[in-house]
Amino acid sequence: MYRIEFTNKMKKDAKLMKKRGKDMSKLTDVLNLLAAGKLLPPNFKDHQLTGDMKDFRECHIEPDWLLIYQFHDDVLTLTATGTGTHSDLFGK
């Protein structure tokens, strides 16, 4: 079981997504699966990022609602670093 840590950016991003009317239980469900060390089902399109973000992973909570996260195995920590739309997170 991983301990979940939230960056300040993640906290702000989550507040914004809640304000936009997103079902936050979906985010909680994904985080709980990840914290339990389970693989996400294929519909979440979980994948490793590349380039400057190569140490992070991304999954799709909804088609345009993403979660960026990172595992730290040395202390069994899952760090949630951001959530939002593609535009919010990557400026695209």
Where on the chain are the PLM-derived regions?
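Enriched for short, Lys/Arg-rich terminal
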Residues: 3, 9-12, 19-24, 50, ...
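N-terminal hydrophobic or amphipathic segments with adjacent small-residue motifs
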Residues: 31, 45, 76-78
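Secondary-structure boundary motif
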Residues: 16-19, 36
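A short, surface-exposed loop/turn module that caps and links secondary-structure elements
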Residues: 33-60
